[in-house]
């Protein structure tokens, strides 16, 4: 019987529910689905049907009705199924959902249908449930309902009835927890199955608390509630615990009926709480937030984020079950019973119908509260101790063993628990003794306790709405959150509230008290205080830390010492280390700059650490602000501000002298960016003498040298020392030119350096030279950054001679040496000391050719320049040549030219330097003659008083043109100034097409340093830039295609030679090294002007608009075309320096010098020497030589081109090497010459087809590829076009060669004693070279791959020979059988058979020893014993042949003339074995096999061994083995990794067959793996697998 469905108005039945019990299926719905809005399809009901949980108190019949309804909804029999199917399905499902404790009993009964099953279950309940007057409802739901109605409070009977029905449905879910059922189809993993039974002792819990519970109620229905309570307790008391299961079930149901009420919407409340309906509420589904005090409070229970719904009650029930009934297995009992504890209407009916968890929770609380009030409740030991109850009260909220609700454990943010208890607990909570709030009453209840059911444990405040109570609890949680450092996992609502309420108080500025939501905002705010404090510190010159430490310490206290990061430079603080790292980049730049910075600091010995105290930091920087502008002195707090500020000075003149000691400001215009990158570190090395900061310690040391030499300029008649520094790193576009002020007669020293490091490298010898008066010293140095690597080689100075020349290293260091020699002039008058130092970006380490201009007292000067050919040529530097100047120790000028660019040949200084006639002047034009001539013609820079100053006209590369206190960029040709280098660049293009007229009054010194790709360079500069590609190494007289090659070479031989070669005459053009001791020696005679680089034909042609290639003379209208063209020459082969004693200078057309000195404009063909008056004619002429190598100086002893008077250059390549006179490209195999490389390629194919690559004959031939063969133009040492340098094999294209070269990777290069590798003509190989020799023809190879290909030819021949030999053998065998059959049988049968095993046994040993023979001495010894072992049989060490010698001797009368037909065919093999017969000798050398020679007899009397190294013959294998030892140290035999190498054959004789069968029995053995093959071809193919 179903109980009457008394539904109050506040609990309307859902329209979607088919009946009252369908609401129970809400447990199966998804947590986020709201009942009434869920899906209605069959699958939805199917899931509900499958996941229905059996609730014991609902009753079996009700459960059956529920299942049928769900199944109908699911199966829809009107359309899909029949009734019988439904019945079976229901039965199956019913059997699945019955309690586990009943399943065995029910299954034993085997019910046939659902009715029988229900009957069994009802009988079971009646069987184990004792009869009682007051609890007749125990046997059936109707009785239970009736009893509850009778005992229900009168104030809300109807409502309570409805609530009871709903609670029954809740109980039906709770009493049979899902955990008890094994729902395999349930996707939501339920908790382990549990037993819902309660211990028997639980029944007495309410027996003792019954009266106390009634007394504790403070509303009208107290008596009624007490009566219902008494009834329930009576039921428990009357029942005897005869059956444990029955007692548990009975007790459980009664306790649940007295517990909290299950709201009518309890079922679907699970669907709306945001947690899984089973996985999170698997233990107590009915109590999961669907429990409410009244139906009206349904909506509030659906809220999410409410913490007291499931968790607290579930934990309470769990603890109750644990503490009270240790044997309880009811997972449902530990389900959240939050809602039940918050519902005020707790009539007896409701108590009965309330879910188990809620009842247990309420009972537990009642028990405690009764005892807590010390009255009413008879709390005896049968229940649980008072202490345990109190403990549970205090700790149930913090229960974390997973039994309670997820919300309680994780989502509840309150620090103290709050909980909705029963009616009794309401009263107790109002008295502030209970921390658990009570559910509100219904409207019919007059007591105010019902309106304020939720009491805060912290402050005692009560709330009627749970949401308000939760928010109130959040406030306490937030307040205590940071105090205890605890983190709470709370619901979304709590998170949002906390985020909004916590942020404002978290980050507070300790200085001003301002608060921030984020630490980043606080950090930004603190910057204001930090900067203000910095200013204050600066004003007070305090030496303390920038930021006050208290804030930092306080923050450390808050966040921990490891959680706060402070910038040691500006004292800004950060919460994260990553933020600090990003911030520090402002101070120190990127990591790379930091690394360089610290490296430089270590070199200097002072490591800059921003972390130390500020006083040290300020001491380092002179108590100034960290970043100071070196131009205007303005200081900045941050390097970025300084960088921005420095941009202002790039438009002006950054070279203002700021101090007397050091007036240098290193802010180069072109490299400003690079400079600025390191400006934040510029104060790392603060020189005490000035305001300059040096980025590197090396710069500091060099700069200190400047100060040690500055005394020369300061206080000795020099008012200024202007050092213009600008790195040359990009394209050496230095357009710096010093125009000495005409109004300045005072002695000045202008040091113009394109490299900031240049000024740091002022000569170290300057202090030595103290002269009476120095009119002017112009030091022009175009140095690159890499130039710092070069070393200074200035020789010891001789002050008394004062004619010291500085050896310029390839950097600004040559400045030091230049100035050392340049300012040493000591005489009555010193017209000028011109020190021109052109340093390129990768300056070669060749020694600078310093031309010394010596003048006697009469004004005579001699410019000494060594010739390439050790010939000193003395040419009058001016109309009045100085005679005897070499003996005069007073020199008018010391012209020290240091050209350390990649092409320093072009230094021919002393143009006007030798023309001093008391009032004469040596005007030394800079590297660009044309530029200087223009300046000279316009009298812009050189017309100063008495011609006492000479102008250093540097190259107009677009670099800053410095005019003291003038505009930054000045045109060197016309004097026009520009504010931007780009404007000057555009302007210079106008001059690039103009050619100034030469002047006869000055001897020209062509000093050019030009980047070939610089589009801003003039025509003459372009020519020189191309010539730079032919860098010449003075040390080894070698050409290099690029400055990088030369620099690399010089790194090796940089310091091997002396820098003071005085009279050897081997100094390279512009690189002659004259130590300072040289100047003043008697050897210096007349002025010698070196003209190695005097071949700029177009330099002085003002009408020529064509850019001429200095290498081949081709003209180009566009500079970029010339640049591209020069790339071809940059890869041309060069002469190996070791083979020749003199450096071969690529001297361009002598027309340059002819123009300089005769005014003629000639364009000379560098190839044949023919000259032309215009470059266009030369252009046409050069097409003939376009593919030729310009200079093949293999036999050239003289690379110097004589100065005036000069004749057209002869083709010295043809003179030195007549073989090259006809054509430059020559076949290395046959010597045939070709005009173009393509013809040679076609010709080489013929050689490859004929296999005529004779490498040993190609040693003296040189391939000079042309334009079309740029791939081959690596070096002149590469003799073949695409020839492998290891094995000599040639290839058509470089790709094939590249693939081939990988085979030789990591192979050593060493020659044998009698072997010469033809691919390397000038340089010995550097490792061991394996020796491979063809056994068939005796040809030698240095790599197995070549031998492999070579052997293929022999294999083809052998196959043909074997075929022919097979036929001949057959005929021979027939003939032998006819004439001497007995002899043949005897030879091949008995004796041969007897000797063969020993031979074969010895042969593997010999072959096994062959690899050792190749590698070491055991060769011969291993072979010797084997041979000797076989000798008794064969009278020789030949295993295969001489073993048969006794037989041959014995049977010679009969079989002497017998020859095997295959012997001839195999004869090449024997010879093929011979080359490695060093190791393989026993197999074939000197052995006349039975098959050998068709027309020859078997030669066994005199065996011999031929040595292929020395062609010596031995008759004994022992002697031969000993002889091989002599070659072991010279030749390394590579063991058996090529075709035919060390491959012997094993010949097996047959007694039953003749020679033909012997051929069939012959096997060839691989010496690598020992595998046998029938023919040599198979062996060769097999060995190819070993060689790869």
Curated annotation (Swiss-Prot):
CDD domains: SCAN
Region Disordered, annotated ranges: 128-230, 266-306, 319-349, 588-610, 838-930, 1056-1104, 1393-1495
Residue ranges of domain SCAN box in the record: 46-128
Zinc finger (C2H2-type): 454-476, 507-529, 565-587, 627-649, 969-991, 1107-1129, 1163-1185, 1225-1247, 1282-1304, 1332-1354, 1505-1527, 1564-1586
Alphabetical keyword list: Apoptosis, Cytoplasm, Metal-binding, Nucleus, Repeat, Zinc, Zinc-finger
Compartments where found: Nucleus; Cytoplasm
UniProt biased composition (Acidic residues): 129-142, 1395-1415, 1449-1466, 1475-1495
Keyword Cytoplasm set for record: yes
Pfam families: SCAN, zf-C2H2, zf-C2H2_6
GO BP field: apoptotic process
Example GO molecular function: zinc ion binding
Coiled-coil ranges (or none): none
Tree of life domain: Eukaryota
Chain residue ranges for the region called 3 X 7 AA repeat of P-E-V-E-A-A-E: 1397-1417
Composition skew (Basic and acidic residues), residue ranges: 143-152, 161-182, 206-225, 295-306, 588-607, 868-881, 1071-1082
Region (4 X 5 AA repeat of P-X-G-E-A): 1418-1443
Recorded GO CC terms: cytoplasm; nucleus
Keyword Ribonucleoprotein: no
Residue spans of the Sequence repeats: 1397-1403, 1404-1410, 1411-1417, 1418-1422, 1425-1429, 1432-1436, 1439-1443
PANTHER family with a match to the protein in the record: IP01015P-RELATED
Family designation: Belongs to the krueppel C2H2-type zinc-finger protein family.
Domain notes: The SCAN domain enables PEG3 homo- or heterodimerization to control gene expression in a combinatorial fashion.
Subunit record text: Homodimer. Interacts with SIAH1A and SIAH2. Interacts with TRAF2.
Record function comment: Induces apoptosis in cooperation with SIAH1A. Acts as a mediator between p53/TP53 and BAX in a neuronal death pathway that is activated by DNA damage. Acts synergistically with TRAF2 and inhibits TNF induced apoptosis through activation of NF-kappa-B.
Protein's UniProt name: Paternally-expressed gene 3 protein
Gene it is expressed from: PEG3
